[in-house]
Curated annotation (Swiss-Prot):
The record marks 145 as: May be catalytically important. The keyword Glycoprotein does not apply. Converts GTP to 7,8-dihydroneopterin triphosphate. GO terms for molecular function: GTP cyclohydrolase I activity. This is GTP cyclohydrolase FolE2. It comes from the Bacteria.
Length: 260
C-alpha cells in the first residue's frame, strides 16, 4: 500500500513535535505505603519530524505504548522513549503521563480515613544529547489571610490554594515526599472526609497559622531546597481568593545551588 506519510510535503519545514494525545491506559505507580497502586493515566507521545516527510506514523505510537505496559519509573519511560525513537526513526522522542495519585488520609481529630487524590505528571524527552525528566505534583492546601486576621475583630477570610511543583530529580523520590512538603507549607492541609470535631480542628489550626500566598511559595521552596534529591524546581502557588473576584499567585524557580 502507498505510504503517503513518506511523500514530500508542500511546505518543507521541520516539525518540532507531532504525535498523539490523551491515550488512556491503566498505570502502576510506586506507593510508599502499599508498594504500588493502580491508577489510570492520560498519555501524550510525540517525535520530531524532518522537513522531507509529509507526516508521521501515528499508529506506531499506540503500538509502542501497548508493548510498553510497565510500572512507571524514569527507567521504564526511558525504554519507551527509546522504542518510540526507533519505531519512528526520530531524533527526539517525548512522553507525558498525567494521572491521579491516591493517598488514604486520616481526619485530624476523629481519625476517619478517606482517599485524597493528587494530580501528577511525568514528562520525559530523549535525544542524542541525553534524557530529561520533569515530575509535576499538584497539591491543594488551605490558607488564611494574615492581613485579614490582623485587621478584623472577628475571623479572617480563608480559601483553598493549589501548590504546583515541577521538579528535576537526582534520583527517585516518593510522591508522598512532595505532597507532605506542600501540605506543611500552608495554613492547613485539606481533607476529603471531615466530621464536626475535624472541622473545628482544621479551622482553629488554620487560623493559628495564617499564610499569604507568598509565605506558602517560600515555605515550599525552602523545603524543596533542603530535600537532597531535587536539583531544580519551579513552584507556583495559586490562591482561589474567597473575597476577591480574582486569584492571587506567587512563583519561585531555582537550581538548588542558587539560594538567593
Amino acid at each position: 500500500m502507498e505510504d503517503v506519510q513518506s511523500h514530500a510535503p508542500q511546505i518543507p519545514l521541520n516539525i518540532d513535535r507531532v504525535g498523539v494525545r490523551e491515550l488512556r491506559l491503566p498505570l502502576l505507580v510506586r506507593d510508599r505505603t502499599r508498594g504500588t497502586q493502580q491508577t489510570v493515566a492520560s498519555v501524550d507521545l510525540g517525535v520530531d519530524l524532518p522537513s522531507e516527510f509529509k507526516g508521521t506514523h501515528m499508529s506506531r505510537f499506540v503500538e509502542a505504548l501497548e508493548q510498553w505496559n510497565d510500572e512507571i519509573s524514569y527507567q521504564s519511560v526511558r525504554r519507551l522513549l527509546q522504542d518510540i525513537r526507533q519505531r519512528l526513526e526520530a531524533r527526539r522522542a517525548y512522553a507525558r503521563f498525567c494521572f491521579p495519585y491516591f493517598i488514604s488520609k486520616a481526619a485530624p481529630a476523629s481519625g476517619s480515613p478517606a482517599l485524597v487524590s493528587y494530580q501528577c505528571r511525568l514528562t520525559g524527552e530523549l535525544d542524542d544529547a541525553g534524557q530529561h525528566f520533569i515530575l509535576e505534583v499538584d497539591v491543594p492546601v488551605m490558607t488564611v489571610c494574615p492581613c485579614s486576621k490582623a485587621i478584623s475583630n472577628e475571623g479572617a477570610h480563608s480559601q483553598r490554594a493549589m501548590v504546583r511543583m515541577r521538579l528535576r530529580m537526582k534520583a527517585f523520590s516518593w510522591l508522598e515526599d512532595f505532597i507532605d512538603i506542600a501540605e506543611a507549607s500552608g495554613s492547613s492541609a485539606v481533607y476529603t472526609l471531615l466530621k464536626r470535631e475535624d472541622e473545628k480542628y482544621v479551622t482553629e489550626h488554620a487560623f493559628a497559622h495564617p499564610t499569604f500566598v507568598e509565605d506558602v511559595v517560600r515555605n515550599v521552596a525552602q523545603r524543596l531546597s533542603e530535600h537532597g534529591q531535587v536539583e531544580w524546581f519551579s513552584v507556583e502557588v495559586e490562591s482561589m481568593e474567597s473575597i476577591h473576584n480574582h486569584n492571587a499567585f506567587a512563583r519561585i524557580e531555582r537550581h538548588i545551588s542558587d539560594r538567593s
